[in-house]
Amino acid sequence: MVFPFNKENKNLIENSDLSQFIISNVLDVRISKKVTTKVSSKENRQINWKIEDIELLDWNEDFDTFILGNIRELSEKMNFNYFVSIAKKCLEHNKNLVVYDNENIIDFKQAFLEKGLYLYTPYLDLGEYDETNGEMWHISKPVVCIAGTSSKQGKFTLQLNLRRELRELGIKVSHISTEPNGELLGCDYVHPDGLGSDNLGEISKKILFLNSIINDFSRYNDLIMIGVQSNSIPYSFGNINSFPLVQSNLMLSAKPDVHILCVNCFDSETYIERTIKTLENQYESKVLCLVVFPLSMCIDKNTGEYHEKRLSVYEMSIIIEKFEKRFGIPVFENGENDSKLVNELISFFS
């Protein structure tokens, strides 16, 4: 069971071919207006689900695990604690529970253990960390980082697509994700830094711990892929919340050889240039290419509200040509020409 149908779970469903389990049902609240909508796997459109109302779920159905996505905003909107309600239902009906948020799980962990059930959430446990007096491992295998200029650019989907393409070529890829559903989609390790994550520990210990994890994976793989969320450099310096501190931790721990930079079609060229220069200078890396997300923000003339608009093929070609001329590196549309992007990677490391 998967609930609700939000960004993270949409990604999980569309890339279900990468999972080691079968999704039986997809659920949401009726007020979302998504109930009865059909959703499908991206790789096989014949595998699909009709979104069902969670209030009508029969907990006696034959499923063993409930996947609960980020529900903080939904709980506030509905004035209802979905985590507590679903955790109690799982205990009552002997179901395992996977939770993307790391909130209040301590109140239920013992109860799940006593019933032989698991309650899982991704988090960074520095208890596994061995002190190294500050020494960093040199990662001997190529490290590729998918970075961006903002949130909501399809960075995780791009990582999954690249990993799929590389593995089809026989390249062993170790994938470290910052998305809470990463392990469900075959990632080797999850370092959550998005909504609802709880990253504890001193910055130096965190960097050393992640560096050790990445070094371990490099021993058995041909290439390391990491992805960071949201922006890679500050939008401004007026508020600490705009500082990409968690992103920097992961990039410092991996020291990427190459960055693939996701950008928006409406990003200023100055901001993109600042990002490229920072990534290349701070991490001694190479920004190999840009990947443009094909959605633009438009203002509704009647309501004055912003809404997303997908750019036409012609509009995208103009933007791609402009960025290629301005920055002198290849530019791709997100979701298109992934094989060409992989060829760029292989050529760089050859």
Model-derived segments and their meaning:
Residues 98-101, 119-123, 173-178, 224-228, ...:
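General beta-strand structural signal in soluble alpha/beta enzymes
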Residues 143, 161-203, 307:
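N-terminal phosphate/diphosphate-binding loop that engages ATP/GTP or pyrophosphate donors
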Residues 99-114, 120, 126, 207-210, ...:
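Conserved catalytic-core segment of NTP-binding enzymes
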Residues 99, 146-153, 197-201:
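Flexible, glycine/proline-enriched loop segments at strand-loop-helix junctions
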Residues 65-69, 145, 223-225, 260-262:
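Structural motif
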Residues 129-176:
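Walker A (P-loop) phosphate-binding motif
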Residues 1-118, 284, 292-312, 321-332, ...:
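Long, basic/Gly/Ser/Thr-rich N-terminal segments
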Residues 185-233:
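Conserved nucleotide-sensing/catalytic segment adjacent to the nucleotide-binding pocket
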